[in-house]
Amino acid sequence: MRNKYIEAFENAQIENKSVPDFRAGDTLRIAIRIKEGDKTRVQNFEGICIARRGSGSGETFIIRKIGANSVGVERIFPIYSESLESITVLRRGRIRRSKLFYLRDRRGKAARIKELKK
């Protein structure tokens, strides 16, 4: 059983942040605030959400993109992180799994996900 004070604090943290509705298979653009010395800048990371796990303030999601020289890059982000400037849903994917780890083995056209029809 969780402590009611910790739960109340986590709920207060979650209420302050608005997160769009997205699932695994969606293509996202994440704007990350990066602090270098005394300067801060915003860097975009665009890729497919391959997993979402956890609940409450500890919930995380994994984004995968294909970088330079066809190297796959995956990053794990906490949904309610202060370093996330914004989360934008670019495309909705039509999938039937909650975890898309099989995309790690696929290359090129085989790694595509169909778009969800409205």
Swiss-Prot record:
InterPro entries xref list: Ribosomal_bL19 (IPR001857), Ribosomal_bL19_CS (IPR018257), Ribosomal_bL19_sf (IPR038657), Translation_prot_SH3-like_sf (IPR008991)
Protein biosynthesis is among the record's keywords: no
Record carries keyword Secreted: no
Keyword field: Ribonucleoprotein, Ribosomal protein
PANTHER family listed in its UniProt record: LARGE RIBOSOMAL SUBUNIT PROTEIN BL19M (PTHR15680:SF9), RIBOSOMAL PROTEIN L19 (PTHR15680)
UniProt family annotation: Belongs to the bacterial ribosomal protein bL19 family.
Name listed for the protein in its UniProt record: Large ribosomal subunit protein bL19
Native species: Campylobacter fetus subsp. fetus (strain 82-40)
Gene that produces this protein: rplS
